[in-house]
Amino acid sequence: MPDQVVTRFAPSPTGFLHIGGARTALFNWLYARGRGGKFLLRIEDTDRARSTPEATAAILQGMAWLGLDHDGEVISQFERAPRHAEVALELLAQGKAYKCFSTQDEIQAFREAAQAEKRSTLFRSPWRDADPATHPDAPYVIRIKAPQSGETVIRDQVQGDVTIRNDQLDDMVLLRSDGTPVYMLAVVVDDHDMGVTHVIRGDDHLNNAARQMMIYQAMGWEVPVWAHIPLIHGPDGKKLSKRHGALGAQEYQAMGYPAAGMRNYLARLGWSHGDDEFFTDAQAREWFDLDGIGKSPARFDLKKLENLSGQHIAVSDDAALRHEIEAYLAAAGLPALTQTQSGDLERAMYCLKDRARTFPELIEKAAFVLASRPISPDEKAAAALASVSDGILAELTPQLQNASWTRESLEEALNAFAEAHGTKFGKLAAPLRAALAGRAVTPSVFDMMLVLGRDESLARLRDAAHPA
């Protein structure tokens, strides 16, 4: 095995980057990055009828959002078809593959007869050991000569040793009659040529591994380390599907989940490091290994995703968070922030991010800094303003005018004002929130006043004291 770890993610471009694929990409990325290796990207676009440029773009965009950078150029499997065919012809020349002239009708007749006689329907070609001199001038496929006795053992890092009797393996087609290679051949040739050392993929590919091993062994190539990871199930224990909610990675971006939270959650979806739930990217790269992957399907839990996302928002750098929120607005098709709003949002981030689980929740709390005068109070805020006389706010404004506009001076001024009116600051907080933000649920009054600054805060208080 080469010294450098090389992993790959090889999606088919027939749709968006779904959650299962995103997790597979993440596991490959973490394993390679944590070992100073390479993470490669191959687009398996051999199915020309279903592969689309739009799907390829969606996959690349989803990976970019998740921060899963790859090494080197994106490999197109379709463009490598001549190389795949070359390997099939090499096996043919070595006597490890053969030309099969059996027609589809003949194969179907063989299987029907086998079924009627209650014997194996596995097709055994009469052309396997035929003298080439007897070959007709007719279309043919190239089949590999599968071993007919013994066992094939898949040494899997997740599933353990999986043993398959060789008499259960057919002589797989490598090259179709039109000269195009089959997927099973293309995967092996590409992985070998790309230097892939570890194949980490869904366990729905486990059955393919035995057939792919035949090609590795026939070519005398080193077999990579296999790690077949369980699929993701919904909360009800059934395979994750549309009815369980959003499936595409970009849908979660548009819903306002931070990429770091999504990476953390996907990493924990089927892999564990002790009891650690929350961890940074650096910790994930350091800790991730194949031994920590469980055999049982993981269940997708939106509440856990929300909780982890909230923790990542809380510890994020303010500028980076503002930048990601702007990307979220674009992904969700929402209006972009103005330059002024962008700067104001970043300044306010310290008092917004502690309790937000998603970007929509954070933006809701940021309404006070994104709004412009005159502030229109919602129903609860209007009720809070109506609970005090306009004169109270009008009287308060000049007293704040001379405050030095620090948290300490504002607290002192507002508490003194409340005491002078025979009440406590808590009684004034609701109308002040309403005046400053037009909402009943906001960051603290002092945080809002500090973020808005003296002039804007006083102007909003005056507006509320003298409504139009």
Curated annotation (Swiss-Prot):
Domain of life, per lineage: Bacteria
Entry's family note: Belongs to the class-I aminoacyl-tRNA synthetase family. Glutamate--tRNA ligase type 1 subfamily.
Subcellular location(s) of the protein: Cytoplasm
UniProt keyword annotation of Electron transport present: no
Amino-acid positions noted as binding ATP in the UniProt annotation, renumbered to this chain: 242
Record-linked HAMAP family: Glu_tRNA_synth_type1
Residue ranges annotated as motif 'KMSKS' region: 239-243
Motif ('HIGH' region): 11-21
One Gene Ontology CC term in the entry: cytosol
InterPro entries xrefs: aa-tRNA-synth_I_cd-bd, aa-tRNA-synth_I_codon-bd_sub2, aa-tRNA-synth_I_CS, aa_tRNA-synth_I_cd-bd_sf, Glu-tRNA-ligase_bac/mito, Glu/Gln-tRNA-synth, Glu/Gln-tRNA-synth_Ib_cat-dom, GluQ/Sye
Chief site of localization: cytoplasm
Enzyme class, first EC level, given as a word: ligase
One function term, GO molecular function aspect: glutamate-tRNA ligase activity
Protein name: Glutamate--tRNA ligase 2
TM helices/strands, residue ranges: none
Keyword set includes Transport: no
Pfam families: Anticodon_2 (PF19269), tRNA-synt_1c (PF00749)
GO BP terms: glutamyl-tRNA aminoacylation
Keywords: Aminoacyl-tRNA synthetase, ATP-binding, Cytoplasm, Ligase, Nucleotide-binding, Protein biosynthesis
Record's function text: Catalyzes the attachment of glutamate to tRNA(Glu) in a two-step reaction: glutamate is first activated by ATP to form Glu-AMP and then transferred to the acceptor end of tRNA(Glu).
Its EC number(s): 6.1.1.17
Record note on quaternary structure: Monomer.
Catalytic activity entry: tRNA(Glu) + L-glutamate + ATP = L-glutamyl-tRNA(Glu) + AMP + diphosphate
Lineage, uppermost ranks: Bacteria, Pseudomonadati, Pseudomonadota, Alphaproteobacteria, Rhodobacterales
